[in-house]
Curated annotation (Swiss-Prot):
The keyword Coiled coil applies. It comes from Homo sapiens. May be a regulator of keratinocyte proliferation or differentiation. Residues 62-74, 208-218 have a biased composition (Basic and acidic residues). The gene is CCHCR1. It is found in: Cytoplasm; Nucleus. Residues 62-82, 177-218 are annotated as: Disordered. Its main location: cytoplasm. This is Coiled-coil alpha-helical rod protein 1. One of its GO terms (molecular function) is identical protein binding. It comes from the Eukaryota.
Amino acid sequence: MFPPSGSTGLIPPSHFQARPLSTLPRMAPTWLSDIPLVQPPGHQDVSERRLDTQRPQVTMWERDVSSDRQEPGRRGRSWGLEGSQALSQQAEVIVRQLQELRRLEEEVRLLRETSLQQKMRLEAQAMELEALARAEKAGRAEAEGLRAALAGAEVVRKNLEEGSQRELEEVQRLHQEQLSSLTQAHEEALSSLTSKAEGLEKSLSSLETRRAGEAKELAEAQREAELLRKQLSKTQEDLEAQVTLVENLRKYVGEQVPSEVHSQTWELERQKLLETMQHLQEDRDSLHATAELLQVRVQSLTHILALQEEELTRKVQPSDSLEPEFTRKCQSLLNRWREKVFALMVQLKAQELEHSDSVKQLKGQVASLQEKVTSQSQEQAILQRSLQDKAAEVEVERMGAKGLQLELSRAQEARRRWQQQTASAEEQLRLVVNAVSSSQIWLETTMAKVEGAAAQLPSLNNRLSYAVRKVHTIRGLIARKLALAQLRQESCPLPPPVTDVSLELQQLREERNRLDAELQLSARLIQQEVGRAREQGEAERQQLSKVAQQLEQELQQTQESLASLGLQLEVARQGQQESTEEAASLRQELTQQQELYGQALQEKVAEVETRLREQLSDTERRLNEARREHAKAVVSLRQIQRRAAQEKERSQELRRLQEEARKEEGQRLARRLQELERDKNLMLATLQQEGLLSRYKQQRLLTVLPSLLDKKKSVVSSPRPPECSASAPVAAAVPTRESIKGSLSVLLDDLQDLSEAISKEEAVCQGDNLDRCSSSNPQMSS
């Protein structure tokens, strides 16, 4: 691209000629033609650099030309000397220029290839944009289909909610009825139980009053028992005094009687006395008890008799207290009264026993009633729980309907979410792989460090053993030196001065101590270093083992997560594949249905067009006949020309109105078809559930169509109005127009009925299979 640095510039051809310079303008060098006039924008900087490098060559060439013009004679004289050198330089310059041209051609070829590649890339991008546009259109169509399906599902959900609401209302009504009946029965049972409880409370209050009286009697009996205890204690004291007296007497008698006889008699007497004392105590206790009971009964009887006698004396006032008969009567009356009181007391005791039995029975009844109440409360709780369960079931069904709605709303986002999950799973997989590789590298480095530390341990042990051996050798040398010194001292006849020997010995000892200290210090330091190294190595080994275990656990967890992610990825791919297959099947069904609907619509439109054309030709024929009759009437009856013109205008206005009505009806039919198409998309889901009614709708459609066709034929084949005589042509023209108007209105009604029948047939065809739909189409066309 750049000219060679060795050349100072191109030599013009006139330099090698011996003839004088011509007057023609000198040509520019050939390399100037190599510079392109229009360069591509990508290589503009290269061309600018090339021009910058070639400018000095141009200036040098101009300088040479000017020098040639000024000194032609001198250049001619130097021809012989510089000829061969100039030729060689020119050949080199030509070779370099050829190389430069080849390089430039190669660059041009590369630029063309790059431009072609850019064009191909742009075309590929354009194709990708078109594909994206098509995919976007397909996605919009699919979204519309899904919206239609969602609308159908919404209708189904509303139906389900209405059904569940009705069932819930029915269950609530039944529950309310059961609850009302149970509450009524419970209230009745409670009222009966309250009445019984009131009676029992009354009986209990009476029993409590009696118990209070009995408690008072018991207190009196306790007081009497206290008095009896006091008397018993007094009698015991007297008995003890008598016993002491008897013992004293025995002692006195025992002194008089021998010991053996005394002991035997004393034992026998003591046993007898003990037995008699026990019997007496038992008799005394029984007598005390009977006496207490009799005393209580006597006191009660005396008290009752005193009260009753007071009553009698109060009620009966004797007229003469000295009469004996009255006293006898009173005495006999008192005796009878006492007998009756005794009988009443016996009866009262029997009533008390019966009352205690009745109280026990009532307590048993109360316990049974309480058990019944608890059982009824348990049944009520069970019924409430069952009601709560039913309400929970209804709520669960409602939540299930909501869940279905949410699933329908989430179905649109499933594919995108699966794609995102797959992308995130792949990215996580890459991150996990990188983490595992980095952790493995770090583990390898740490293991290498541990191995290096373990490899250093033998060298440290060797150094330690070497130091120990060195210490032993130094000690041996010192001992040898000391022994030699002692031998010298012994062998020498004249010992040296004591001061020198003592100094030398002291120095040797100091040196020995210093060497021992140094050796001990070095050995201790070496041992410390070895222990530290061992502890550090052990700690590093433990840490590395922990790290290795953690890394193994993390590796296992990552493997498990990778396995789970792989499973999730596989499930997501399967779901995506299923969704794509389902979308493809739905698209295929949609295209088939669209084709079927298009064919059926085209057939119906063609049929309607043929019928309309036939009816239009019929109307035109009738209009032509009416015009001919009108012309005949105009020719024959000049006097009614004005009326004929008016009738003509009326007929034209009627035709215009008919055309406008037909246009409006066509527009209305088109709008109706669009509305039916929109309603058809919305009612696909509901019509699929009505598959059982398809046969009835088809039969109904087949029965309606022949009646419509017969009606049309009867309208079309209606008898033409007879030609009137020349005396009444207007009366003949008016019925024809009325018949035309009636036929058009009938035609419009038939068209409306036919459009409704077409929409019903399309709904039926959507619910049935393709064979039934294809078999019903010829019947519709017939």
